[in-house]
Amino acid sequence: MLQFITIPNLMDYRVTLKLMEDYVNKVISDNELEVVYLVEHSEVYTAGTNYKQEELLNYGDIPVIYTGRGGKFTFHGPGQRVIYPILNLASPNRHKDLKLYIRMLEEWIINSLNYFGIKAYLIKDKVGIWVKVRKDEFAKIAAIGVRVRKWVTYHGVSINISTDLSKFRGIIPCGLENSLVTSLNQLGIHIEMSEFDKIIQNEFNKIFK
């Protein structure tokens, strides 16, 4: 059985990282139940294992944390829903296939956005979830960066709901120079975080049966 846990307050990224790592160890050693954490972070830039230092442009007083997830630099902050699925891909109802897992994450978020009338896309050689904002021009609305330890997943997905998009100017998001970033709010969708959470939980159950 899987449980969704919503953290009600802004959470420091370092605290979340320890929470994830501790829970991953429990799943590995004690066969603990799977969980999906729904988090909203205080402002932070995080760097994945493929980052380049020159992609950190002007971070000001926002902390920068170097993590073990895949990917490059991204921003987390208020108004962004960050989702951390801790799933055991070695369990009988899962598949020991990291590429398949990432495809399922992508499908999950695309379907969730579609519920709100947002047509989202995958773009070849560009990680994340994208929406068309102008003719032949796309903006990233969700970032993906995961890690797996002994087939247990952690880190995950961040979706911009009402995020302050100006903060992305402090980095080259995901190493994609001149790429645009958007949010549900910027696309004219104004919803409470709790409303979005209901949809992603419903859509999760369709993909990760």
UniProtKB/Swiss-Prot annotation:
Site entry (Lowers pKa of active site Cys), positions: K140
Main location: cytoplasm
UniProt xrefs under InterPro entries: aa-tRNA-synth_II/BPL/LPL (IPR045864), BPL_LPL_catalytic (IPR004143), Octanoyltransferase (IPR000544), Octanoyltransferase_CS (IPR020605)
Catalytic activity: octanoyl-[ACP] + L-lysyl-[protein] = N(6)-octanoyl-L-lysyl-[protein] + holo-[ACP] + H(+)
Gene Ontology CC terms: cytoplasm
Pathway, per record: Protein modification; protein lipoylation via endogenous pathway; protein N(6)-(lipoyl)lysine from octanoyl-[acyl-carrier-protein]: step 1/2
One MF term in the entry's GO annotations: lipoyl(octanoyl) transferase activity
Every BPL/LPL catalytic domain range: 30-209
PROSITE patterns assigned: BPL_LPL_CATALYTIC (PS51733), LIPB (PS01313)
SUPFAM superfamilies assigned to the protein according to its UniProt record, in alphabetical order: Class II aaRS and biotin synthetases (SSF55681)
Class in the EC hierarchy, top level: transferase
Annotated substrate binding sites: R69, G70, G71, K72, F73, T74, F75, H76, A143, I144, G145, G156, V157, S158
Function per UniProt: Catalyzes the transfer of endogenously produced octanoic acid from octanoyl-acyl-carrier-protein onto the lipoyl domains of lipoate-dependent enzymes. Lipoyl-ACP can also act as a substrate although octanoyl-ACP is likely to be the physiological substrate.
Note: In the reaction, the free carboxyl group of octanoic acid is attached via an amide linkage to the epsilon-amino group of a specific lysine residue of lipoyl domains of lipoate-dependent enzymes.
Family: Belongs to the LipB family.
Protein name in UniProt: Octanoyltransferase
Source species: Rickettsia akari (strain Hartford)
